[in-house]
């Protein structure tokens, strides 16, 4: 099961609308909609907040491919940050 499907399932299990979940996570309803439709992914901080809110781990939220992609993107951002500090 992919992240978008898991998020929607968890939200519905709690009986929340996208708007209600958005308020709990301090994001827009549009962000929730994009995440649930697979048109976008939350950043790592939002993923941590989602996991905490639903009492699951980040690993449980992501498929192995999604976790790998997220790790690679995080590494690129870190490298970019260090590059900017050095130069």
Where are these regions (language model features)?
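Hydrophobic alpha-helical bundles in membrane proteins
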Residues: 73-87
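Short basic helix-loop element that most often maps to the first helix and adjoining turn
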Residues: 5-20
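Hydrophobic micro-packing sites on short alpha-helices
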Residues: 42, 46-54, 60-62
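Short C-terminal boundary/hinge segments that cap the last helix of small helical domains
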Residues: 55-77
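Alpha-helical residues within the helix-turn-helix
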Residues: 12, 23, 34, 52
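Recognition helix of helix-turn-helix/homeodomain-like DNA-binding domains
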Residues: 25-41, 63
């Amino acid at each position: 099961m992919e992240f978008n499907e898991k998020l929607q399932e968890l939200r519905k299990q709690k009986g929340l609308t996208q708007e209600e979940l958005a308020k709990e996570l301090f994001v827009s309803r549009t962000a929730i909609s994009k995440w649930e439709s697979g048109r976008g992914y939350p950043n790592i901080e939002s993923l941590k907040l989602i996991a905490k809110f639903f009492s699951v781990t980040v690993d449980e939220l992501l498929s192995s491919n999604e976790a790998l992609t997220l790790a690679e993107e995080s590494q690129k951002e870190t490298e970019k940050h260090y590059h900017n500090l050095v130069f």
